[in-house]
């Protein structure tokens, strides 16, 4: 058995694959790979002897694609599988076990979590940017606000205004700088600036590239497509006394089978959090509130509220499934089909979720045709119009709901009118007109009875119209309201998480270049100059990764704006539903009152 196969088997036996994957993702792999130098630098931070470190580097070079088997690790790159194998070798070496014998390595089933040295711990840093509210700066402005670096060990914070506590960003030694460059965190661990700087499109486009960019092929987005999933409230509640919760049965069709699963509100909330973590820059639908509160006091969850929340959850899950990207996610499909308990599954899926841009590179055609001025104007205008339109549609939903409630109240009054009209001259009260018994009493009594029946029919029509409005026109208005809201929140997330640390990295490159010049002038040791050169190289690679991510965000939002354009079809459907309902019930009312007219026109007057 080869060393790679033995190490892979040991990874499966120990169950440390997810730990090693987490470290792999921290280096922001490009096309599913990270430079092999990351492993060599990682070896310098673990507690093993120098001889073992050299041996580990040699073994890693032998299992890498492109490695020459004799320490050729600097010219190679790691895939996720080879990274797991190499990191397991280091883990085994740290435990003092034989790490170069496949026959012994394959039997390893228990390991101590990797222990990093103080230098390695010091290199664990977080990038953060202070952002509050909606920025008033352009979407692609030249400046970044309040860049800061926070050390997880010393709690030192260095701001870009030059004031610092603890270490200075310019006083760190090259080893700490290189470790900092290698500690790129995933998007879920970063709070980036709200205003990414403008990037030069030609910097990423080869001269030979040509053509017109088109969005990646996706399933067709049809905002008015019929719901593929239905929700119903389960009558029996679960949980302990005073902490009982409502369950929902989700019914969907998979092939020829109809699948029904049970979920609670917190499960839907988890699904939204998962989508926001993985698809931060896409239109993630909005959830209805879990409970209603007035002045900080929660209202009781009566049947009326539970029904409204059920409709809101139905809109949420169906809008997720309609989205050409979100709806194809494996976790979303599993959410609506997995019958088993999903507690463990949710934890596993959420912990392993990574931003959708991991391992992707921007299409050069998109960069080439990008018009920054046009995009800035378009996006800024969209933000303003989204706010205005959203507020108007919110008011529309309130008014439609109010009309439906008035119809229900009017139906109750119509029922009372029908009752009292029928009781005005009952058969037992004919004694009122017994003196002049000319036959008119009987005709009028029959007329009252028929009028009462017609008014009862009118009452039923009003109730049907109110219910139809709530599940028809009002639901369509709410779907459009939530489409506007999800797009508006997308731009909010862009401002909060769409920035980068390019200015900070460029400043650090300039500082290190100056140090290299000074070191050459004073004829410093070549090892010091090489460390500075490696730091500059790693910073340059990080800038390229940040630029690539910024372009991917722009491409993603451009695609989402294209999808959003189709939501105008929801307005058409809303108007059609409104018109059809009005014509339908106008004809029914006309037929009902026309029949009453025929019944009463021949009464004696």
UniProtKB/Swiss-Prot annotation:
The record's annotation in Pfam families points to:
PX (PF00787), Snx8_BAR_dom (PF19566)
What the entry lists under SUPFAM superfamilies is as follows: PX domain
The protein's location, in the record's own words, is: Cytoplasm; Membrane
Gene source species: Yarrowia lipolytica (strain CLIB 122 / E 150)
A single Gene Ontology biological process assigned to it is: retrograde transport, endosome to Golgi
What name is this protein filed under? Sorting nexin MVP1
Quote the record's binding site residues for a 1,2-diacyl-sn-glycero-3-phospho-(1D-myo-inositol-3-phosphate): 264, 266, 290, 309
Q: Which residues form a coiled coil?
A: none
Q: Does the keyword Membrane apply?
A: yes
Q: MF terms per GO, please?
A: phosphatidylinositol-3-phosphate binding
User: What family classification does the UniProt entry report for this protein?
Assistant: Belongs to the sorting nexin family.
């Amino acid at each position: 058995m080869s060393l790679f196969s033995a190490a892979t088997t040991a990874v499966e036996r120990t169950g440390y694959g997810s730990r090693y994957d987490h470290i792999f993702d921290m280096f922001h792999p490009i096309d599913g790979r990270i430079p092999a130098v990351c492993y060599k630098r990682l070896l310098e931070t673990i507690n093993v002897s120098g001889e073992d470190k050299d041996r580990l580097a040699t073994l890693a070079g032998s299992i890498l694609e492109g490695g020459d088997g004799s320490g050729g690790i600097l010219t190679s790159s790691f895939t996720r599988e080879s990274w797991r194998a190499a990191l397991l070798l280091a883990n085994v070496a740290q435990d003092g076990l034989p790490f170069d014998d496949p026959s012994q390595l394959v039997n390893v089933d228990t390991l101590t979590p990797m222990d990093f040295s103080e230098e390695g711990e010091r290199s664990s840093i977080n990038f953060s940017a202070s952002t509050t509210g909606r920025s008033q700066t352009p979407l692609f402005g030249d400046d970044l606000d309040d860049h800061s670096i926070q050390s997880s060990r010393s709690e030192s914070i260095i701001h870009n205004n030059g004031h610092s506590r603890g270490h200075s960003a310019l006083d760190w030694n090259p080893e700490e700088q290189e470790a900092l460059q290698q500690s790129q965190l995933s998007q879920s661990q970063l709070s980036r600036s709200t205003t990414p700087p403008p990037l030069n499109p030609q910097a990423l486009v080869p001269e030979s590239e040509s053509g017109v960019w088109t969005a990646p092929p996706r399933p067709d987005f049809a905002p008015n497509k019929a719901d593929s999933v239905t929700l119903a409230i389960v009558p029996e509640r679960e949980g302990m006394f005073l902490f009982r919760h409502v369950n929902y049965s989700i019914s969907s069709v998979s092939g020829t089978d109809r699948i029904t699963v049970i979920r609670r509100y917190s499960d839907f909330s988890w699904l939204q959090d998962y989508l926001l973590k993985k698809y931060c820059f896409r239109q993630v639908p909005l959830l209805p509130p879990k409970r209603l509160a007035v002045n900080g006091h929660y209202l009781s969850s009566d049947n009326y509220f539970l029904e409204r929340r059920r409709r809101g959850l139905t809109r949420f899950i169906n809008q997720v499934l309609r989205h050409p990207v979100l709806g194809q996610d494996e976790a979303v499909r599993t959410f609506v089909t997995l019958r088993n308990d999903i507690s463990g599954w949710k934890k596993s899926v959420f912990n392993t979720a990574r931003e959708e841009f991991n391992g992707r590179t921007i299409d050069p055609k998109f960069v080439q045709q990008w018009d920054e001025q046009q995009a800035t104007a378009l996006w800024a205008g969209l933000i303003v119009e989204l706010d205005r339109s959203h507020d108007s549609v919110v008011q529309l939903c309130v008014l439609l709901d109010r009309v439906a409630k008035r119809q229900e109240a009017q139906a109750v009054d119509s029922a009372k009118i029908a009752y009292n009209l029928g009781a005005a001259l009952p058969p037992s009260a004919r004694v009122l007109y017994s003196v002049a018994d000319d036959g008119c009493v009987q005709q009028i009594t029959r007329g009252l009875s028929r009028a009462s029946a017609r008014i009862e029919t009118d009452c039923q029509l009003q109730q049907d119209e109110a219910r139809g409005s709530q599940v028809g026109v009002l639901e369509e208005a709410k779907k459009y309201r939530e489409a506007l809201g999800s797009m508006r929140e997308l731009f909010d997330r862009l401002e909060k998480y769409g920035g980068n640390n390019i200015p900070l990295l460029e400043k650090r490159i300039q500082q290190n270049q100056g140090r290299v010049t000074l070191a050459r002038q004073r004829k410093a040791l070549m090892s010091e100059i090489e460390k500075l050169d490696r730091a500059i190289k790693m910073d340059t690679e990080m800038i390229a990764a940040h630029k690539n991510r910024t372009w991917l965000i722009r491409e993603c939002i451009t695609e989402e704006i294209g999808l959003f354009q189709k939501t105008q079809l929801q307005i058409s459907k809303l108007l059609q539903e409104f018109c059809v309902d009005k014509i339908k019930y106008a004809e029914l009312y006309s037929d009902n009152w026309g029949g009453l007219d025929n019944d009463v026109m021949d009464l004696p007057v």
